């Protein structure tokens, strides 16, 4: 797994692409200022310390996609600990100036979604998009936005995920991402990828959940070959970020999880 120093050596180019992407997404939309930072009670964390620099202006923000779950508030899984650990990793591993706190984003909240070029959705095997959410997400992605889906496992959750995703893109196929795709080489050369398990690995010893025995790297492309949706099926990158500071969670999984996330972020900023 080799490291490409393009982000460390030439951050200006990356940021110029980012600002152009941000402008493209917001173009021809009614102007709406980004929502201020806001917190929500999570499934796992009801209260979490806010970093002292949370209000500082930054170049990139971890935007977490809010949705209605079929059972409970699945969108808050790992939130906000996972988000803040990943933002800190972005600061350390690149010259991208990441905000220290995340931003929950709802597709139905006016045009706010267009302010956030990179979205992360967790446990999407439990979501149930409305027609309005699906239409807004489709428009956002076709305008240049990027959506990373993570932490869902097995056949049953895949079927739930695709039922809503087909409302977003009824005619666009979900395909396996080839090994030579730029997303696997944006910063790190990720030729040696393996299944990244959730915290359940610590007491089961299994890297898989349900019948999700094999990690699948899938996506949806636009007409120009840009990856719009990156689908991390049968893996839990969010847990690898969340538990990165716990000695019990194997370092090799957190290391790969951060590298995948950084690649996906830099790819989104440069495509």
Where are these regions (language model features)?
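An acidic, glycine-rich "communication" segment
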Residues: 32-42, 46, 70, 157-238, ...
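Residues embedded in well-ordered secondary-structure elements
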Residues: 16-19, 51, 219, 253
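Core RNA-modification/binding signature centered on pseudouridine synthases
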Residues: 7-8, 28
